[in-house]
Amino acid sequence: MPAESDSTGRRRAGEMSAVPDEVEGPLSGYHHETYVFRLPTEARAGEGGRWKCREPRESLLWFDRRCFVSEERLLTELQGHIDNIPDLIEVEGTVLQRFIEGDTLGALHASDTAVPEKEFEQILALFRQLVAVRPRSLLVKRRCEPQDRASESDSAGFLDRLICFTEERVYGDNLPEYGKLFAALKLDADSFKQLRKHVAGLRDRPFCLLHADLHRENLIVDHERRLWAIDWELAMFGDPLYDLATHLYLMRYPAEQEQRATERWRALVEDVRPGSSRGWREDLPKLLDYKKAQSVFTDVIRTSQSLCLQPRVDRKALRAASWTVWDVLSRGARPLGVEEVPSVSAVEAALAEWLRARDGRTRSRRRDGDRDQGRVRDRDRDHDHDRDRDRDRDRDRDRDRDRDRDRVGR
């Protein structure tokens, strides 16, 4: 773990750890800063092992709508419903998740490669358990108000709420910082009108629990080849076909295995809850296209941010970022109504201009900050001068009073 890390999460982990110097982290992750450690013997639950505590990252941009107030509360409620999810324990007022020892599925089997049958079957078993969990079966506090939720089985309304989040929170809220970059990439408010037309007409399907982020890095293979699902931060109730679409989009199975996953998913969800795959042939492509469109805005912002974190952006880094943006824009162009995707060179020019403008804004804010600090120093100096003057006046008054007393005494 980097020695310079001194976050609240790191300090808390060190205080709870049996051996503070053996705290591991922060682990990679977008939403949280995570630390892993062993608890002292007296604090352990069950068979021991390592545990993890997590601290939400500050100033985080959320690219996905969240449903539940607490992931830990959700995991507590899911015990007995979903197999192979992390256990929880509360220590000194902090809820910890058991750390699953093993490797991510992605570390063992990269994107675009087939998932072995043993793990593939366990993924399907997880979908079987998810579709069996209905909205009324879990008593977990939600973030959104009832009026902001789609009605039961209203798949079109469910997707529209997701589009609204992308439009308002990802696109709209970031216009001050990224508006000119979006415009240079031919992305504007009309993009969402085109997207809504493109995905219109979804069939109704009964809602169930969705993991909503089921990809190779959120699936852990332990030493006995059991598959564990982690990171339930984005879980929600909604259209079961959306969970399949998200999974297929993120997993990047080879074509044959993707087709088999779709066919097996359809059979198992219909077995558990009839109607869960209704209209899948027409609707799955629409949901996949929404994921492509959503990724355009997400990846443009993330890629731009990654450039800002580099101490120096050279031509090679800028060109690599441009290819990333061009690729995601090419895949999302049709649902967003982008008729002609800008070339890689045009994307590179747009990113370079955005970086220059951002550097200018940063320097301007720094100058404003220096001026503010200067005004504070001047104000403090004036205050010190007034205080010294008052002190001198009080000293003179005391001296005069003492002199008057001496005269009276004489």
What do these predicted regions represent?
Residues M1-G25:
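Juxta-kinase regulatory segment immediately upstream of eukaryotic protein kinase catalytic domains
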Residues Q79-E92:
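Conserved HxN/HPN-centered segment at the entrance to the catalytic loop
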Residues L78, G106-D148, L181, L185-L202:
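Conserved kinase catalytic-core helix
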Residues T298-R375, D404-R410:
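ATP/Mg2+ or Mg2+-diphosphate-binding catalytic cores
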Residues L241-G275, D289-P311, V328:
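Active-site activation/catalytic loop segments of kinase-like enzymes and analogous catalytic loops
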Residues H31-F68, A107-D112:
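ATP-binding glycine-rich loop module of kinase domains
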